[in-house]
Amino acid sequence: MIKKLITSVLFLSTATLCFADTNILKVYTYDSFISDWGPGPTIEKKFEETCKCDLQFIGVGDGAALLARVQLEGKQTEADVILGLDTNLIERAKETGLFAKHNKTLDLNLPITWNDDTFIPFDWGYFSFVYNSEKITTAPKSFIELAERSDLKIIIQDPRSSTPGLGLLLWVKAVYGDDAGKIWEGLAPNILTVTKGWSEAYGLFLDGEADLVLSYTTSPAYHIIAENDFSIKAAIFDEGHYMQIEVAGKVLGSDQSDLADEFLEFMISERFQSIIPTTNWMYPVINLKSNLDKAFLSPISKNKSLIFDPKTAQEIRGPALNEWLEILSK
């Protein structure tokens, strides 16, 4: 009996020591990334196969909520890496002084040249309003047409908490400039609800609560590939579509700095990037060895691709948000 007890104690002690020796990398990201159907579970498994570590993804609402969380926690944050900001937020993120430079030479395949020294892209896509073609036979081809269609109800996301919501704000601004307010005045009666994040908005759309939802031109690819459903389509606007490039960055002063660097290197490898298209339903940032499914063929030509540089996005964000809040509160 005593021998069994000693053996048990030794086993538990050894297990505890092994656990204590395992490096833990904490990555803050948005909720849909770590959902059962998102890329998180597969990425966690693949990274842990080689890192000899415990990769822990921590869901923090939607993309814009990530930055708010890190700002709130400041230097006391437990995060080693933040994954899920985008180009519209990285200037604000840099101003916090909480992120380290990556010091990497990047070989990326993006529609634009990437030269940021702090954040590294992991996927990209175009915002679009998604609809069910079995219910809507003629989709709007512009924001003006959408605003004039009183028969259509739309769901959008809050630009204060959601990167798609902020992307929509800047999309309207990129197309209409000083006349953006008039577009929002026209759209306001059509807005069924404003959700905190993308997942909630898309779920309501799939439940039939609205005619269109703010999402991505690649969203139909999910329904085609995973469900063999060709009815969900992206409305293509003649005036162009705003691009989203999602990024990750290392937290300055992380206790796992080397491991964080290893993860960021892994993030732009074939092993990570090959997971993105059919789990996050976005485009990879490198040339993959195998071709993407034809469902991912982009309907957006280069001259219809819209994006503000990070500094301009930061300058526009505040006034555009105030304008949006004022109009939608009427």
Positions of predicted regions on the chain:
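A ligand-binding cleft/hinge motif common to bilobed small-molecule-binding domains
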Residues: 88-92, 206, 210-231, 280
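A bilobed periplasmic-binding-protein/Venus flytrap-type ligand-binding module shared by bacterial periplasmic
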Residues: 128-135, 173, 244-257, 275-278
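Extracellular/periplasmic bilobal clamshell ligand-binding domains
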Residues: 293-330
